[in-house]
């Protein structure tokens, strides 16, 4: 069958059809996006400009913050502008690029969270060999692996979609281009493509979740052998990570580990993992982590002192 593609652009339905609600959402999500940028940039700068960057855990945390900024920036700016726009359109090429970006940075974040769980496992269960196992070369290779894995996943998703014919309609009941809403617009049978898309996303999400579950199960068992202070410190750092895993994996599992169907709740769930989660990341890691808070106080307190002294 020859591919027929009469669609040159798509039209988003957006978050709401009510102008009043859209104005409120514009203010709220503009504020959220600013928090995402400032909060994650603060973590990146604090880690990179302090001794924390030498620690594998904070090395990965800085890149997690970077990915969070990129991940939310794929969808948030366009969504915010569209909230006040009469025509919420995106070109066909722009749609495919957005689909790629969402899955690339989303999958990369999953892999980084998995690597961070392994890092905590080595730190708590094999403390004497920690710096030998998690040396900088190993960390760089792991980080590279997360980016390569994210790229392979997203390129497969996009390749499955671009080979489909789109001849109309071109209205997407969403605020960004994602696989399931776009598949509904293809003018051909998409059952097999939907199964492959779900298998691709499901394998990554389920496989990563199993690794996370095993890592933290072993960690919790090993904590019984440690002192009260050791348990408190370990639970503090692991607690932050577990919180991020739960609030990110929960919505992603609902969206991608299911058949090729769409639900009315999809847009609200998508808001949670594309905007709310990246916004909560800095809060969770700073409020529950004494080392990050102390590094921020020392670094930014010193800078303020130097500026005052210079004047």
Curated annotation (Swiss-Prot):
TM region positions: 24-47, 56-77, 99-118, 138-156, 194-217, 234-256, 268-287
Origin: domain of life: Eukaryota
Keywords on record: Cell membrane, Disulfide bond, G-protein coupled receptor, Glycoprotein, Membrane, Olfaction, Receptor, Sensory transduction, Transducer, Transmembrane, Transmembrane helix
InterPro entries listed in its UniProt record: GPCR_Rhodpsn (IPR000276), GPCR_Rhodpsn_7TM (IPR017452), Olfact_rcpt (IPR000725), Olfactory_Receptors (IPR050427)
Cysteines joined through disulfide linkages: 95-187
Residues carrying a glycan: 6
Location relative to the cell: Cell membrane
The keyword Transmembrane helix belongs to this UniProt entry's keyword annotation: yes
Chief localization: membrane
GO cellular component annotations of the record: plasma membrane
Claim: Disulfide bond is one of the keywords in the record: yes
Extracellular-facing ranges: 1-23, 78-98, 157-193, 257-267
GO MF, one example: G protein-coupled receptor activity
Cytoplasmic side: 48-55, 119-137, 218-233, 288-311
Recorded topology in the membrane: Multi-pass membrane protein
PROSITE patterns xrefs: G_PROTEIN_RECEP_F1_1, G_PROTEIN_RECEP_F1_2
Physiological role: Odorant receptor.
Family to which the UniProt record says this protein belongs: Belongs to the G-protein coupled receptor 1 family.
Entry protein name: Olfactory receptor 4S2
Gene designation: OR4S2
